[in-house]
A protein has these predicted regions:
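N-terminal catalytic scaffold of extracellular/periplasmic and nuclease hydrolases
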Residues: 2-9, 15-25, 30, 34
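Residue-level detector of anion-binding/catalytic polar loops
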Residues: 11, 69, 343
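Catalytic-site neighborhoods of secreted/periplasmic enzymes
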Residues: 28-118, 123-131, 138, 142, ...
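Short, surface-exposed beta-strand/loop micro-motifs that present aromatic residues
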Residues: 60, 104-108, 332-338, 345, ...
């Protein structure tokens, strides 16, 4: 079904999350602002929770003002509620993807002159459900039911660990393969939920006037993916089906990121001004360094609506990323600039050991290598290199897509390093990043 959506729309090959942490990333998806600006620095939980500032204006709120009905189903993970307000909350088990889609049908087909915005967010393929102790190597279940059980309407797909594809940032071990088999099974439920949602749109006459954006909040829930700003954490699947585009099955090489989603959907909805930067008059104030200041509310991204049908659009050649926390105790701020040639990571708190999300630390795929010692391989790095990181990591991403050779200390690349540091500083200044002061004070 994911492939069918791509065949009827546009596949973006270079789409990126701006942080690889669930709450923070979803805050960017819905606000169009990097999380260091919207305040959602990390996870929303009942203890010491992060949440966005009260002044942040999010996509569901803006679309409601523009005359849209709004609803969400599944995983939300953002706050406060009034900032991320959806008029309708549809109940469903966020692992039961077909049930989620079915429960959305009443909202989709409701008789109304208003158009609708639906935020369909699964918990799959996040880790969860404990470990499958009955299986070799005791992999995390990734939400899969024990004993080959199935969720309502889902035909569970089972994978042979010996035959799964192992991404290069992971170690090719029995433990990794066992976990990937569970991960891919969980992902197959997402595919089936999407398929059911597509059927419901067609059945109710909404397919030909509904734009669909399909993506993941970040990369795979494995060490080297989630919580990192390596390619495994930031590079995400991204498909857009614009019902009005003539060219179908398009592959687009524009570099886009999650800050571009809100501007694009507001553009499609007609709630965007001619400058393609600031939304219409209801957006009039944005707090500045010394309190509120008058002026247009400017998003950090831009609309890609006009280039969806293109293959190699001009001036879409760089993205920026910003990660600060996962959980409250997992502080490790990183800032990133990545273009076609180079990628620079600034590990602001580099003297600290890299912190682990609890589920990633406990993962058999990580623990197996950790127990072998600091020199044990983990993907293209060692365990030691994964945990202890330098201040700067500079990669020739065009020649070294697996980020295996750090060029930051190379005399040959000294000028490149300074050039990309300057790009990061400008990005931080433009987006009012509080961590910009770390250039001066640390």
């Amino acid at each position: 079904n994911i492939d069918r959506l791509a065949a009827d729309g546009t596949l973006f090959r270079y789409a990126f999350a701006t942080t690889a942490s669930c709450s923070a990333s979803r805050s960017v998806i819905l606000s169009g602002l990097h999380n260091h600006r919207n305040g959602h620095y990390g996870h929303l939980h009942s203890f010491h929770k992060f949440s966005s500032f009260p002044w942040v204006k999010t996509l569901p709120v803006l679309l409601a003002k523009a005359g849209y009905r709004t609803a969400r189903v599944g995983k939300h993970h953002n706050g406060p509620e009034d900032v991320y307000f959806f008029e309708t909350k549809i109940k469903a088990n966020s692992r039961s993807t077909v049930e989620m889609a079915n429960n959305c049908e009443a909202f989709i087909k409701a008789e109304s002159e208003k158009p609708f915005f639906l935020y369909y967010a699964t918990s799959d393929p996040h880790r969860g459900g404990g470990n499958a102790n009955e299986l070799p190597h005791k992999p995390n279940r990734f939400g899969n039911k024990p004993n080959k059980g199935a969720y309502p309407g889902v035909k569970e797909t089972f994978y042979d660990p010996a035959k799964v594809t192992v991404p290069p940032f992971l170690p090719d071990t029995l433990e990794t393969r066992a976990e990937l088999a569970q991960y891919y099974q969980s992902t197959s439920r997402v595919d089936q939920g999407l398929g059911r949602l597509m059927e419901i749109l067609k059945k109710n006459g909404k397919w030909e006037n509904t734009i669909i954006v399909f993506t993941s909040d970040h990369g795979m829930a494995f060490a080297g993916g989630k919580t990192t700003v390596y390619e495994g954490g930031l590079h995400v699947p991204f498909i857009v089906r614009n019902p009005y585009q003539e060219k179908r099955g398009n592959t687009n090489n524009a570099m886009i990121s999650f800050v571009d989603i809100v501007p694009t959907l507001l553009d499609f909805a007609g709630s965007y001004d001619a400058q393609k930067r600031a939304a219409k008059p209801e957006l009039t104030t944005l707090p500045g360094k010394r309190g509120a200041k008058k002026g247009p509310y400017t998003f950090h991204g831009r609309s890609f609506l006009s280039i969806i049908a293109e293959k190699n659009p001009k001036d879409w050649d760089a993205i920026y990323a910003s990660h600060t926390f996962h959980e409250i105790q997992m502080y490790y701020p990183m800032r990133v600039v990545r273009d076609r040639k180079y990628k620079l990571i600034w590990n602001i708190a580099h003297p600290l050991p890299y912190p682990f999300a609890s589920d990633l630390w406990a993962a058999p795929s990580w623990q197996a290598q950790w127990k072998k010692g600091q020199s044990a391989p983990y993907g293209k790095k060692t365990v030691r290199e994964y945990i202890s990181r330098p201040q700067f990591e500079l990669f020739d991403i065009s020649a070294d897509p697996n980020e295996s050779v750090n060029l930051a200390s190379s005399a040959k690349h000294a000028k490149v390093l300074e050039e990309y540091k300057a790009k990061l500083k400008k990005f931080q200044k433009d987006t009012q990043d509080p961590w910009i002061m770390k250039w001066q004070y640390e």
